[in-house]
């Protein structure tokens, strides 16, 4: 599949936003409880797609795998921009 020079749209269901946020919080806390660096582990998962970066502890692995990685990235970008005063419409 080739790349196109045209801009394409990507839309995330609004209902998923809160669920993704809650899931990331749950995964972060589970990683922290197990003694891992949560940021490094979540980044490793998002970049590679390898679920081994997230432990089964507290069902964290199954929880994060409910979402596509691009949905997670979108929520992270949205949260970052809003936290820096960008008014997202």
Curated annotation (Swiss-Prot):
Kindly give the InterPro entries that the UniProt entry links to this protein.
IreB (IPR009309)
Similarity remark: Belongs to the UPF0297 family.
Q: What is this protein called?
A: UPF0297 protein SMU_2079c
The record, for HAMAP family, names: UPF0297
Which one Pfam family would you cite for this protein? IreB
- Coiled-coil intervals: none
According to the lineage, what is the superkingdom? Bacteria
Annotated source species: Streptococcus mutans serotype c (strain ATCC 700610 / UA159)
Q: What is the annotated signal peptide range for this record?
A: none
């Amino acid at each position: 599949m080739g790349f196109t020079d045209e801009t394409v749209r990507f839309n995330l269901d609004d209902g998923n936003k809160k669920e993704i946020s809650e899931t990331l919080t749950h995964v972060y806390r589970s990683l922290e409880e197990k003694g891992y660096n949560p940021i490094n582990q979540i980044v490793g998962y998002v970049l590679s797609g390898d679920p081994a970066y997230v432990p089964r502890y507290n069902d964290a692995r199954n929880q994060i795998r409910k979402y596509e990685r691009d949905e997670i990235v979108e929520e992270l970008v949205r949260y970052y921009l809003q936290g820096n005063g960008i008014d997202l419409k």
